[in-house]
């Protein structure tokens, strides 16, 4: 919840870096985009993106919004030039001719599974149909059910992966297919809860939400369900449920932005339009298969084999076999505003780190204090949209499950020295090639499958 976070303290600008206003048109456009996405009113052309609240996922939003203003650059350009002044020098105001053109029409046909989708089917879940992500929105104004239905019809037509199906062949292999059209009537439900009391409203919504979650079917479809809860004079609720095979955290941001724009246009009586498509999930899948056989990815193999050889497990009291869903418990911890400010702003400035560096240092120290062994092996997740591995690929407005999962081995030789520990963890994480996306490609897409299928506890 970004609204509950402290506003970035722009007094943390580096010494000697005063506020410098944008002067050129491209600088002004970029400042406006950064202000909107980061929710900061005043941004100068020398403010560092990552020190005022930016991160790798937000950078994808920046790229997408800039494209709508006909300003073109890649996520890697933000990392290489993290100020508006620097970025304006590498950005282009017209799109280069791409070797691989984004498909603007309906996409259909088989799609190679991405590494994270291979991982999903490898789990052999008892109920693979119920592995969903969802969001429940409370409307500020009454929602027009007819316009809402039209909006989602358009979104499902535009974002192709929402029309996917999966089937398992006799060999055990799962096949992913993009349908050219969807039975839109099966996506949409309206519940009239106007007569339900305030006391019972939440339980009624929860019950229907559970049924909607259980109704998804990756083989028969659909992968998406939308429900409008009409609550009389009380604010309506909108529930969107999508199977994880078709969506990730970045995808939700794209979907919300498109839904808001389309619904508002329909409400105003205008013909809705969506931004041009970026490369399809299908194009990404085929490109990853080709990349998996390349010399570049095979050069990463010694690194990942060394990581696998270094992995160690946490000590356990009992050997109960594989962990199941019923073994999972959640522990919630909250930080004060002062602690949050230190974590997000003060410490990163002092050590030139990102939040992952600090959190993983703290975790390694905590586990080490418990086990008296200051080494830790764990899996990390990334957004997986490392499009720089594929020339001319743009995924900034593509919906799908792109997440990367990869093992990391952390080791502290001098845990008493906090500064040295932070530096050690930081350097270990910086050595990971292409932010870890190569591990899954080698493990699942390479023809000779050179990496093991061992998992961490």
Where are these regions (language model features)?
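Regions immediately C-terminal to embedded phosphopantetheine-bearing carrier domains
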Residues: 1, 10-125, 146, 150, ...
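Structured, non-catalytic alpha/beta "coupling" segments that mediate domain-domain communication
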Residues: 1-6, 161-163, 303
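Hydrophobic (often cysteine-bearing) scaffold residues that line and stabilize catalytic clefts
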Residues: 22-30, 59, 144-145, 201-205, ...
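Acyl activation and transfer enzymes in specialized metabolism, enriched
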Residues: 27, 72, 140-163, 240-257, ...
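Amphipathic alpha-helical segments in well-ordered regions
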Residues: 33, 37, 61, 86, ...
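Flexible, P/S/T/G-rich "lid" or insertion loops adjacent to the active sites of thioester-utilizing
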Residues: 35, 39, 117, 121-132, ...
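Acyl-group handoff/entry surfaces in thioester-processing enzymes
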Residues: 65-67, 105-181, 187-189, 196-291, ...
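His-Asp-centered acyl/peptidyl-transfer active-site segments
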Residues: 106-109, 124-132, 160-164, 184, ...
């Amino acid at each position: 919840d970004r609204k509950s976070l402290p506003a970035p303290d722009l007094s943390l600008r580096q010494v000697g870096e005063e506020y410098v206003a944008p002067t050129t048109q491209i600088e002004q456009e970029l400042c406006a985009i950064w202000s909107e996405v980061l929710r900061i009113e005043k941004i100068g052309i020398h403010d560092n993106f990552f020190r005022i609240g930016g991160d790798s996922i937000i950078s994808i939003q920046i790229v997408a919004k800039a494209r709508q203003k006909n300003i073109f650059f890649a996520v890697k350009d933000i990392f290489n030039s993290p100020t508006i002044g620097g970025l304006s020098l590498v950005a282009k105001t017209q799109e280069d001719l791409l070797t691989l053109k984004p498909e603007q029409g309906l996409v259909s046909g088989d799609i190679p599974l991405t590494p994270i989708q291979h991982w999903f089917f490898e789990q052999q879940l008892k109920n693979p149909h119920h592995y969903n992500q969802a969001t429940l929105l409370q409307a500020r104004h009454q929602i027009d059910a007819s316009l809402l239905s039209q909006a989602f019809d358009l979104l499902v037509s535009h974002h192709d992966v929402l029309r996917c199906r999966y089937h398992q062949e006799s060999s055990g292999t799962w096949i992913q297919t993009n349908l050219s059209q969807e039975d839109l009537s099966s996506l949409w439900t309206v519940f009239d809860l106007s007569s339900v009391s305030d006391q019972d409203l939440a339980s009624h919504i929860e019950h229907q939400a559970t049924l909607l979650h259980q109704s998804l079917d990756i083989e028969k479809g659909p992968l998406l369900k939308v429900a409008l809860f009409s609550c009389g004079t009380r604010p309506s609720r909108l529930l969107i449920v999508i199977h994880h095979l078709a969506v990730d955290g970045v995808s939700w941001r794209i979907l919300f932005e498109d839904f808001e724009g389309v619904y508002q246009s329909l409400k105003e009586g205008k013909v809705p339009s969506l931004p041009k498509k970026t490369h399809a999930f299908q194009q990404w899948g085929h490109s990853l298969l080709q990349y998996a056989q390349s010399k570049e990815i095979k050069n990463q193999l010694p690194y990942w084999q060394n990581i696998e050889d270094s992995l160690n497990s946490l000590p356990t009291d009992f050997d109960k076999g594989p962990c199941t869903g019923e073994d999972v418990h959640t522990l919630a911890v909250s930080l004060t505003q002062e602690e949050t400010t230190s974590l997000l702003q003060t410490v990163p400035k002092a050590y030139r780190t990102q939040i992952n560096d600090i959190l993983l240092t703290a975790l390694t120290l905590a586990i080490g204090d418990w086990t008296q062994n200051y080494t830790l092996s764990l899996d990390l997740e990334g957004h997986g949209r490392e499009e720089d591995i594929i020339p001319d690929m743009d995924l900034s407005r593509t919906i799908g499950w792109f997440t990367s999962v990869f093992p990391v081995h952390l080791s502290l030789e001098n845990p008493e020295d906090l500064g040295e520990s932070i530096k050690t963890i930081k350097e270990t994480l910086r050595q990971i090639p292409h932010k870890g996306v190569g591990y899954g490609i080698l493990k699942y897409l390479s023809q000779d499958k050179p990496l093991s299928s061992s998992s961490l506890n």
